[in-house]
């Protein structure tokens, strides 16, 4: 027979792995006589142990042993049996006891074991899978493929140890001995990490969650930005998703809106009129797929004394006074029959479409035609939303009530509504169409919710970047001037802010990467809340103490009224308030009254917290809480100090010098306002309270040029046990970098916001207002200290002041105590020099 013929008869079974070869004979380790020497064997008989495993033909040395619990997938699969497990060189054996003389009840060759992995069937348990068909097992890597393909030949046994260390010890020992496992186990508890990158050829991001991809697709974040700081891009996306309602409807970014004021309310500050803004609707989603709540709404400029007469009727809440005017005589005819949910946005004469930036002015003579166009656009947006939910731009047909903040001055465009806890049921539509009813839940997509600046942005920059602040006295700045949108001299309606909007409760939240949810904080029961409210409220009928002058605004959970005090109660709570008050109340005082419906407040405990904070924070630079009345268990009246001058935002927007080449305010005026604000902040910080939402909207003035801080809905108190916070609240453009990066922070975030507010008064808007929402957050996180438009026109003192306020490193950022000693405040003007800024209200 030839060699080739013999080779054809060789089968795979002729080359089976029959185990290790027997050990060769070796000399005695103690130097004694070996067996191959010429000696009488009888002298060595005593040294022979016929039962020794070292002299057997096959290796049976024991490597590891111990007691375990065992069960298989056979007839007794429901019983865990106690067995003694032994690991030998060539097999694993299970015995009834630890005596090696007994036969094993189960012996598994190591060459038949194809898988060993931990299982949750029992604590400290692992599964051993073996192949029962010996013919299907072959050596090498190919054998595992053959065995795994034949599921019928597999059998499993489960072995449980007593401790975690025993479990890992057995796994390591079995892996090391089994030839088919190669010492590498199957993965356990693994997580699939998504690799995100940027493809320069296609210009798109790859390997990214779907909702992130849609956000970045139309944003201004470029591949260069990704390459420069990809971690910052991820932080921005996580920030946007986590705090824009992804998986949690409470974490929504409140959306500022604009509307029209009543000519009968010229004496009201726009902070009051801000509550009216909740009555008007705007498109809530930009065409980029990014939430339009950061789309700019500040007008570039506006001539003073240009108001469009609109009067608000009574709201859905019970009015305070039945004599409250509800006339429509001041409403333009073409607006009287406009349904509430089709009420257009008219700010600065612009009517943005699809949530984009305004493209051009709208002439007042064409307002009716523009209104019809907006209605058609909103109908188209609803149809588009049915096909493309991510690009929804119109309002939802059924608004849901959003809790109304306690402070009547509150402009309602903060990041997170502190009273929001869960989505509310939709409100029924009101029969009175001419009354502006707030529409809080107009965004049907969480990603379309509430991430929007408060002002109309100028045209995108076309010149070089702004120059940074000089770090020393000799620093010079030579930069190109960034153009700002031209001033609109046409007659436009007076503008204000509208209430935030919330995503609908029944809309599916977007997918993507999300952080683990933190456990919910325990909340007080209704009985506890009512008990605390009664302790801080006056037990009297407020309708007998105040005469309502006019209605300033309407919210989903309450109304705001301008009233005059007619009587001072004599209850003990009121006497205590009078004794602790800075200005004793008098009959005839003008006050602001916020009437709140408690049943429409999801988190009533925050109302109690805010009242307590305001009650303990009485200062000449803080809008003071006067008193509160719990009329019924569902009707709360909060009385606040009246600031007839309006907000700093209104003063900036209506300044006669607010144009491309001049600052809205002079440096002495800025120094005075910032100094007064800083004094109020120092008072709060000395009490370990962080305001967390300092901006021009929350700084109010009166006719005597007194400057006061308002809006304590987002304040937090620091303690020894919790000296820092990490909650993402506030308004994005005024946020410090550490807040955007989701790091812990302290009182110095208010100092950063104070510096941004100073830039507002210098340039008419905060930095990055004209940027895409995600790009703005990216720039805040990466650029740090923003750059000025015209640093060459500023004094050295104000640039030094900004440099210590806007220091990225918190360790070197000034405190409010240090700021009050800064030389910039030496140039502050007298209060009478601010009266010219209030002439636009006359």
UniProtKB/Swiss-Prot annotation:
Keyword Ion transport: no
Comp. bias (Low complexity): 279-296, 308-319, 372-387, 418-435
Annotated stretches, region: Disordered: 12-34, 247-524
Catalytically driven reaction(s): L-seryl-[protein] + ATP = O-phospho-L-seryl-[protein] + ADP + H(+); L-threonyl-[protein] + ATP = O-phospho-L-threonyl-[protein] + ADP + H(+)
Gene Ontology annotations of biological process type: cellular bud site selection; cellular response to starvation; intracellular signal transduction; mitotic cell cycle; negative regulation of gene expression; negative regulation of sterol import; negative regulation of transcription by RNA polymerase II; positive regulation of protein import into nucleus
Pfam families membership: PBD, PH, Pkinase
Stretches assigned to the CRIB domain: 184-197
Composition bias type Polar residues, residue spans: 247-274, 297-307, 323-343, 470-481, 488-497
Binding residues annotated for ATP, in chain numbering: 552-560, 594
Domain of life: Eukaryota
Single GO MF descriptor: protein kinase activity
All residue ranges annotated as the PH domain in the record: 61-179
This protein's record includes keyword 4Fe-4S: no
GO CC annotations, alphabetized: cellular bud; cytoplasm; fungal-type vacuole; incipient cellular bud site; nucleus; PAR polarity complex
Subunit text: Interacts with CDC42.
Protein name in UniProt: Serine/threonine-protein kinase CLA4
Gene field: CLA4
